[in-house]
UniProtKB/Swiss-Prot annotation:
Designated name of the protein: General transcription factor IIH subunit 3
Species name: Homo sapiens
UniProt GO molecular function: RNA polymerase II general transcription initiation factor activity; zinc ion binding
Heme recorded as keyword: no
Matches recorded under Pfam families: Tfb4 (PF03850)
InterPro entries, alphabetized: TFIIH_Tfb4/GTF2H3 (IPR004600), vWFA_dom_sf (IPR036465)
Similarity field: Belongs to the TFB4 family.
Gene symbol of the encoding locus: GTF2H3
Keywords, ordered alphabetically: DNA damage, DNA repair, Metal-binding, Nucleus, Transcription, Transcription regulation, Zinc, Zinc-finger
Quaternary context: Part of a TFIID-containing RNA polymerase II pre-initiation complex that is composed of TBP and at least GTF2A1, GTF2A2, GTF2E1, GTF2E2, GTF2F1, GTF2H2, GTF2H3, GTF2H4, GTF2H5, GTF2B, TCEA1, ERCC2, ERCC3, TAF1, TAF2, TAF3, TAF4, TAF5, TAF6, TAF7, TAF8, TAF9, TAF10, TAF11, TAF12 and TAF13. Component of the 7-subunit TFIIH core complex composed of XPB/ERCC3, XPD/ERCC2, GTF2H1, GTF2H2, GTF2H3, GTF2H4 and GTF2H5, which is active in NER.
Subcellular localization(s) per the UniProt record: Nucleus
Its job: Component of the general transcription and DNA repair factor IIH (TFIIH) core complex, which is involved in general and transcription-coupled nucleotide excision repair (NER) of damaged DNA and, when complexed to CAK, in RNA transcription by RNA polymerase II. In NER, TFIIH acts by opening DNA around the lesion to allow the excision of the damaged oligonucleotide and its replacement by a new DNA fragment. In transcription, TFIIH has an essential role in transcription initiation.
Signal sequence interval, chain numbering: none
């Protein structure tokens, strides 16, 4: 049996840093801005690290152009994750100016530095304005897989992903998103979702399939309270708490032709691609369907009457 000392708990937080959505929030003169969202994320991360000294944290920003690790930063190494000697200043600072726990202070500084660099140096070009959420989740899974390889023989690591979603879903990412969901399910990784704006059908499916929690925040300025109440406890602790009831899951699929969510469609019998309109040839695997037509009845010849 693995003791609490040997059980690692990794929390990967994926933050939606879509500059267009957050820019619209700023134009509305909203009380809730990206900086306040990052502040709430840092408090959640600090609380997670403070719950147990074996708890681990990673934060990923999901932008419209890239997915970037906010923590650990660019100078982080695999050895640093498990407390090996030779840590850089990012993980083992020489001292804390205000007496705070050094790891919490360094984590906050790295997150603030990385998010500022991401938002100031990004140059928005073209028509692509959708958050690369599927890629960020794939990056989180790769990170968890890499960390699992570094776990010692006498240790066990439980991992979960928390997505803080702001912008709307992207139907173009449907296939990649579903692949990520089933990969997480196979690795027993929970996906939780905290949605700030409109509901996300894709994240509802992700939470339902992996056993995570889905919550649409009623009031965005109260984000921190919901993060600490709902998403700070791990899977074992949640059974002892009164949490929001599960929501109705929208299991509509996106068609491969127009990426629209549909309830009834045509499915290719070879590659299982979904289409909203019938096509004699599958555009995915180029299979030609044999169309069974009704039998054609030959017209009966009329008998000519012979005149007497």
């Amino acid at each position: 049996m693995v003791s609490d000392e040997d059980e690692l708990n990794l929390l990967v937080i994926v933050v939606d840093a879509n500059p267009i959505w957050w820019g619209k929030q700023a134009l509305k003169e909203s009380q809730f801005t990206l900086s306040k969202c990052i502040d709430a994320v840092m408090v959640l991360g600090n609380s997670h690290l403070f719950m147990n000294r074996s708890n681990k944290l990673a934060v990923i920003a999901s932008h419209i152009q890239e997915s970037r690790f906010l923590y650990p930063g660019k100078n982080g190494r695999l050895g640093d994750f498990f407390g090996d000697p030779g840590n850089p200043p990012e993980f083992n600072p020489s001292g804390s100016k205000d007496g705070k726990y050094e790891l919490l202070t360094s984590a906050n500084e790295v997150i603030v530095e990385e998010i500022k660099d991401l938002m100031t140096k990004s140059d928005i070009k073209g028509q692509h304005t959708e958050t690369l959420l599927a890629g960020s989740l794939a990056k989180a899974l790769c990170y968890i897989h890499r960390m699992n390889k570094e776990v010692k023989d006498n240790q066990e690591m439980k991992s979960r992903i928390l997505v803080i979603k702001a912008a709307e879903d992207s139907a173009l990412q449907y296939m990649n998103f579903m692949n990520v969901i089933f990969a997480a399910q196979k690795q027993n990784i929970l996906i939780d979702a905290c949605v700030l704006d409109s509901d996300s059908g894709l994240l509802q499916q992700a939470c339902d399939i992996t056993g995570g929690l889905y919550l649409k925040v009623p009031q965005m300025p109260s984000l921190l309270q919901y993060l600490l109440w709902v998403f700070l406890p791990d899977q074992d602790q949640r059974s002892q708490l009164i949490l929001p009831p599960p929501v109705h899951v929208d299991y509509r699929a996106a068609c491969f032709c127009h990426r629209n969510l549909i309830e009834i469609g045509y499915v290719c019998s070879v590659c299982l691609s979904i289409f909203c309109n019938f096509s004699p040839i599958c555009t995915t695997c180029e299979t030609a369907f044999k169309i069974s037509l009704p039998p054609v009845l030959k017209a009966k010849k009329k008998k000519l009457k012979v005149s007497a």
